């Protein structure tokens, strides 16, 4: 069987198994195995390609585990809640959608997972929604839209692994996402949300915010600022501080600055727990990426885009979008797309930095489909049923599409 068709069958099998609620990791490994065998490679060669795919992303997995220190600091010390509440308080009720979106953007941009960012902000959104009788759909889209914008400029696993597979500096890939993220935020808040139907309004008992012992805003910001400064040393001064060092150093400094050094173990355990799940998932995506990379599927995609103007450029976001749709995950989508198509994208004349940035942006278009955990975690945070949550999918995709179009336009015209 043609290796491109075989790899595609393996990918479809993985999707079906994930939808059927089988473990995503085992679904991806099984899909990779079936794809390789159908391609006629034999068991030994198939396994070799699967292991090769995992080896390619091993450095990124190590960096992602190290990033757990910063994530643990932001969530367990209360720094994330402080930052979100400060933004919402500063902008006030009149600009509540902007406040929620900006809070989600900044939290994800600092290294908080997008689903964790939404869950962190959701209690405040519910309180404000009940108080002002706002649409729960618009409230959730504001948080998800802001989170997607922050995700393309964050030191989160999707950006780390895209940069790694394209051999591009993480700080430069993050910087490439800044303007698309700002534009995406403005479009989300001032265009998409106003055009949405109101849907069901928030109704319920008015709740008061819990009086938690949270760190001061300036203390909460120290850890992320240290991380950003360390990563910025490469483009500014030519001093290379690897993300494997910068991210945990920023996290440890943040833990000390917020006065939670006695709870450092809890912060580290939380971060490791969040990242270990991603790391294990990436082992599965690595096996499938190895099979896809060894197949002729990239040649088929190149052939399909050959007649298009800027077809090589479009390969990056299209690959990101298709793979994120297959896995319903930004990280897994960016992993498979960048590991499988990076060489072809760079060979088409796209720079490594913008190749990684466009794959990353493309991975936000369809990463919220129902066979992924993000769909259910975010819907649950606002008390939505599956039927209600499904209504948001088109609007989420529009946000991702805006980010992608802006990223491609910046590469082509700026």
Question: What do the PLM-derived regions correspond to, one by one?
Answer:
Residues 69, 82-85, 115-128, 156-166, ...:
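Re-entrant/interfacial helical elements at transmembrane boundaries that shape
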Residues 1-2, 19, 49-60, 167-179, ...:
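Interfacial loop-to-helix junctions that mark the boundaries of transmembrane helices
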Residues 65-67, 90-124, 283, 308-350, ...:
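Hydrophobic alpha-helical transmembrane segments of multi-pass integral membrane proteins
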Residues 1-4, 55-60, 87-102, 129-139, ...:
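Membrane-interfacial loop-to-helix junctions in multi-pass transporters
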